[in-house]
Structure formats: structure tokens, C-alpha cells
Regions:
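Divalent-cation
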Residues: 1-266
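Long, highly charged, low-complexity intrinsically disordered interaction regions
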Residues: 228-349
Length: 349
């Protein structure tokens, strides 16, 4: 997350339902008022305006609501504990770029470019609350709108997780059969990205919901828990460079690629470092993901096993005839490991 994105996330959190600031904003909307509220970087904000009057009074939702009945901006300290100015006329340079059309929103966007303040604009006509940080605006939604979207995303998350679980089971069988194609891997990677995209969308709503989002967060975790590590291991299994550092870079490349492009096996192969590979090209997995799902393989042990054997198939070829080799690596109960892998395969050791 960039610095600007972090600042926007913090600003949205300040306006979440249940906060005094959000209560004031809801009253402003209910009163069919417009408003311009500047939070933080108060020296720079005050330097960019004039007139109005000095207050230095403690912040309450009712006070902010009453002060917004006047035309000018209200200036609040960064911790939202003090109201410093009211009816303050802001004069940011008109040369500061903005695509906003309304006077109040243009001023808000320019003030957020000129200063490090969070600027909140409430449209009197449209009855919309917009938060501005670094020239970018984020339109807040009410709780009913947010919860409607939450329900849609949770259904999508549940369905995608179900598809992903089935695809991973199939992939494990193919890995143990030693016949995995680029197309097989591309399907699973695509589902991982869809799952994480939906989870990211849900995270933004959880942030906007504030305390109201706690139960949503718990439901999100039910569907996403453990998937982050499994995704990284899957990439390491199939990427040309299997290091953790390279996997992080590859994940970022997948994240920046449109999900629909990830349905193209050739494009997925390119991102994994295999130029010219097609849908039916065969890939050999290292086995990190599969081994990590076996209870007797302690954390970090999968890497040692892969370093020793080179691939999952080499391990499968050797495990039945030479279990002592695993014992030498420090694997507890090599027989249980062998039995677990064969059960995944649907066969007996």
C-alpha cells in the first residue's frame, strides 16, 4: 500500500459509522446542508484562507453540525478533538489540477493537494460525502448500501473458495501423477487472484464500516485464512525462480495483471518465467505446497526435502524404497509422510 493509499485508509477510518465525525456528517446530510471540513495540517490550511472566526473549542458532533450551517469551511485538528476555525474562506490556487466540477468539491480537491490535510466535502444538492486526500476523492456510502455490497461479495467469496478448493485437490492428484500442464496451473492461479481480488474489495468495505465491520471481517477470514501462504507456495512450485523473493515479485506481477488475462495459459507461463510455453506444455512441480499440507512436515522442512530431491516426483519415486533418506533430513515418521502422500494420490504405499 502506497503512502497516499495509507493516508486515504486512515481518513476513511476516521469517518466510519459509530464515530462522532460520522454522526455529524449524517446529521449534515439529514439537514440537507453542504459542508467543507478540513482535518489536520492546520497551519497550512489556515495559511490558505482568510476571514471566518477563531474558536478553539472541543469537538462534538452537534457543534460541527451547527457550524456547517454557515458558508465557509470548518477547520478541525488532526485528532478530531478541537474545532479551530469556522466559516473560514479557503483560497487554494486555481492552477492546482482537478477534474471536479462543483465549487465545493474543486476547493476540497485543491486543498488536499496543497496541504496534508484530509478534506471532507458534503454536496448539498447530491447529498453525497466525499473524502479527499492528495487530490483524490473517495465517496462514502451509507451502512445499508455497504451491507448490500458485503452480502454480494461474501457469496462471491464463498463460491470462489469452493471452486479453488476443488481445483487444488485436482492439481494435487495431477502432481502426484506427474502430469501437470500450464493450463492446469493457470486455472488455479486465476482462481487465487479472483479470491484475493474479492477479499480486497471486502477489506475496503470493512474499513469503511469501522466497528460495524467486525462480523464481516470474521466471515472474510473463514474463506481466506491460509490461502495467502498456499498461493505463494504454488507460485514457488512452478516458477522458474523458486526463491521466496522471486515469488513475491511474481505475485505482484499477477496482482497487476487483469484477471481475465490470467485465463490465458500462455500469459501465465510468461509470468512464471517460461516464454513460449502453451496450454499443454508440461510443468514439474517442486512439491512445496503439497508437502506443506502433510502434518509431519514441520515448517521449513518442505524446503529441505525439495532441496534434497529436486521435485515431488523424485520424492515419490524414492520414498517407498529409501525412507531412511528422509530420516536423515530430520523428517519425523517418514512412513507417515509416505502414507499421507499416497492417500492424497488415492493409492496405498
Amino acid at each position: 500500500m502506497s503512502k497516499s493509499e495509507s493516508r486515504m485508509a486512515a481518513a476513511i477510518k476516521q469517518t466510519a459509522p459509530g464515530t462522532a465525525l460520522r454522526h455529524a456528517l449524517d446529521m449534515i446530510i439529514a439537514g440537507h446542508l453542504g459542508a467543507l471540513i478540513c482535518i489536520g495540517d492546520t497551519d497550512a490550511v489556515i495559511a490558505a484562507g482568510d476571514d471566518g472566526f477563531k474558536l478553539d473549542i472541543s469537538f462534538t458532533a452537534n457543534r460541527l453540525f451547527e457550524l456547517c450551517k454557515m458558508d465557509g469551511a470548518v477547520v478541525v485538528d488532526k485528532d478530531i478533538t478541537q474545532i479551530l476555525r469556522a466559516n473560514y474562506h479557503l483560497n487554494p490556487s486555481p492552477s492546482l489540477p482537478t477534474s471536479e466540477t462543483g465549487m465545493r468539491h474543486r476547493t476540497a480537491a485543491r486543498m488536499s493537494l496543497l496541504t496534508q490535510a484530509t478534506i471532507i466535502s458534503v454536496s448539498e444538492r447530491r447529498q453525497v460525502i466525499t473524502v479527499y486526500v492528495d487530490g483524490k476523492g473517495y465517496e462514502l456510502r451509507n451502512v445499508s448500501e455497504l451491507m448490500s455490497r458485503v452480502n454480494q461479495l461474501l457469496v462471491s467469496l464463498q463460491n470462489t473458495r469452493g471452486q479453488l478448493d476443488r481445483a487444488l485437490l485436482r492439481l494435487t492428484t495431477l502432481e502426484l501423477d506427474n502430469y501437470v500442464t500450464v493450463g492446469d496451473v493457470a486455472q488455479v492461479l486465476y482462481l487465487f487472484e479472483v479470491l484475493l481480488t474479492v477479499a480486497d474489495q471486502l477489506d475496503r468495505i470493512i474499513l469503511e464500516l469501522g466497528r460495524e465491520g467486525r462480523s464481516v471481517q470474521m466471515q472474510r477470514e473463514e474463506f481466506v485464512a491460509g490461502m495467502d501462504e498456499e498461493y505463494t507456495l504454488l507460485i514457488r512450485d512452478y516458477a522458474r525462480d523458486s526463491s521466496e523473493e522471486a515469488a513475491s515479485t511474481t505475485r505482484e506481477a499477477f496482482r497487476e495483471t487483469a484477471n481475465m488475462q490470467l485465463r490465458n495459459p500462455k500469459r501465465v507461463a510468461e509470468l512464471l518465467g517460461f516464454e513460449g510455453y502453451g496450454e499443454d506444455s508440461v510443468l514439474t512441480p517442486l512439491g512445496l505446497r503439497t508437502l506443506s499440507n502433510v502434518s509431519v512436515v514441520r515448517r521449513g522442512m518442505a524446503d529441505k526435502i525439495v532441496d534434497e530431491y529436486g521435485s515431488l516426483q523424485q520424492l515419490m519415486d524414492d520414498i517407498e524404497h529409501n525412507p531412511d533418506r528422509l530420516d536423515d533430513l530430520g523428517v519425523d515418521n517418514p512412513g507417515i509422510l509416505a502414507d499421507s502422500l499416497y492417500r492424497m494420490w488415492g493409492k496405498h504405499a
